[in-house]
Structures are given as C-alpha cells and as structure tokens.
C-alpha cells in the first residue's frame, strides 16, 4: 500500500483590498499565534493632529476619523508590525514604506510552500500447511502401546461392587479381585466382633 500527498504546487491566494493594483507586501503563514500591533508614529500623524486640533469639537464628524483619512490610514497600515501575541516581540525586520500612489491599496499574498510525503508499505504473506499435523497424528497412533485387557469374573454374586463402596470400584477388573473381597469380608467380621465385645 502506497500513499503519497504532494502540496508543493498549490497556487498562491491573493486578496486585493480597495483596488486591483499589485503590491510588494507578502505575508507568510506561521504555526505560531500572531497578533497585529499598530504603531501610529509617522510624519503624517503630526499634521493630522494639527488638523484635528484646529477644528471645533462640534465640527468633527465621521469623515474626519483616521480610518477615513487616506494619509493617516496608510501610515497606520504601513507602520503596523507583526508581533507574537504571547511575548509581544516584533517579528518584522523593518516596516516597508509604500509610494504615495498606492494610498488606499493593500494586497496581501498568502503563499503555502510545504511538501508532505507519506509512504507506507505493507507486505504480508501467510502460508498454512497441514501436512505436518497429519504426520504427527500418525506417529502418535504408532507410539501408543496396546496393553492386553484383563478380565476377571467373580465366582459369587456377593463380590459384585456397587457405587456405594468406599474404594470407588478401583479393583473392579483386577486379577486379585477374589482375594480382595475375601479379605474385606473378614475385616468386616472382625470389626463387628470388636464392636460387640465393647
């Protein structure tokens, strides 16, 4: 079984904001958590502050906000730096400045260049042979010894064993069966005589 996954030839995904003009700013995805920290220090900030301070509070409207002012919004975007959200350390070497003709245009190009290859080889073979088992069973039959069966019959019906005997019938087919029962009868008689004497 072989599995191969190749994602090196994925196309880049451009996202253009405001206009269809191109830009040289490229952001690359990272596995770490990245936040955006905006810096508002720029030459345009001083001019914007003077403009805002020169107007009365009643005259300031939504059109005077930083997001609607092209120069100020451009300076905010151009001076924004990538930071690690956990440590707060800047991850950009320098902020890139753009020409004034690109005010209001921002394009971010996310490119993914990764290679992933997975290979798994599964080779298995199973062979089952029953010939050796048959040979072993034949050898077992040959190795068994057949002893002659000895059968003995009692002359008297008194010597027939029943299931209640204490010896569990271990001497049922014994050649000393007749002598055994005779001895047992004598032992019973002796035991009964002792009980009577006491």
Curated annotation (Swiss-Prot):
- What are the boundaries of the region Interaction with VP1? 1-48
- What name does UniProt use for this protein? Non-structural protein 5
- Where in or outside the cell is it found? Host cytoplasm
- Positions of the UniProt region annotated as Disordered: 13-37, 53-72, 129-167
Cofactor(s) this protein cannot do without = Mg(2+)
Q: Which terms are listed as keywords in the entry?
A: Glycoprotein, Host cytoplasm, Host-virus interaction, Magnesium, Metal-binding, Nucleotide-binding, Phosphoprotein, RNA-binding
- Keyword Transferase tagged: no
UniProt superkingdom: Viruses
Keyword Nucleotide-binding appears in the UniProt entry: yes
Residues recorded with modification Phosphoserine: 67, 154, 156, 164, 166
Which segments cross the bilayer?
none
* Ranges annotated as biased composition (Acidic residues): 153-166
Principal place of residence: host cell
Query: Which amino acid positions bind Mg(2+), per UniProt?
Result: 92
One Gene Ontology cellular component term attached to this UniProt record is: host cell cytoplasm
Q: What does this protein do?
A: Plays an essential role in the viral genome replication. Participates, together with NSP2, in the formation of viral factories (viroplasms), which are large inclusions in the host cytoplasm where replication intermediates are assembled and viral RNA replication takes place. Orchestrates the recruitment of viroplasmic proteins such as capsid proteins to these factories. Participates in the selective exclusion of host proteins from stress granules (SG) and P bodies (PB). Also participates in the sequestration of these remodeled organelles in viral factories.
Q: How is it modified after translation?
A: O-glycosylated. Hyperphosphorylated on serine residues, when in dimeric form. Phosphorylation by host CK1 is required for the hyperphosphorylation of NSP5 dimer.
């Amino acid at each position: 079984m072989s599995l191969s996954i190749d994602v090196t030839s994925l196309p880049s995904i451009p996202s253009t904001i405001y206009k269809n003009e191109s830009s040289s700013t490229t952001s690359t995805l990272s596995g770490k958590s990245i936040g955006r920290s905006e810096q508002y220090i720029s030459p345009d900030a001083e001019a914007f502050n003077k403009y805002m301070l020169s107007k009365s509070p009643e005259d300031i409207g939504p059109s005077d906000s930083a997001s609607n002012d092209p120069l100020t919004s451009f300076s905010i975007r151009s001076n924004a730096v990538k930071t690690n959200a956990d440590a707060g350390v800047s991850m950009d070497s320098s902020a890139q400045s753009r020409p004034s003709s690109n005010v209001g245009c921002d394009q971010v190009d996310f490119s993914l260049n990764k290679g992933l290859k997975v290979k798994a080889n599964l080779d298995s073979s199973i062979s089952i042979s029953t010939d050796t088992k048959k040979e072993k069973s034949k050898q077992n039959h040959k190795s068994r010894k057949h002893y002659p069966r000895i059968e003995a019959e009692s002359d008297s019906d008194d010597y027939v064993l029943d299931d209640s005997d204490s010896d569990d019938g271990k001497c049922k087919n014994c050649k000393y069966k007749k002598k055994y029962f005779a001895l047992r009868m004598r032992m019973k008689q002796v035991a009964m005589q002792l009980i009577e004497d006491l």
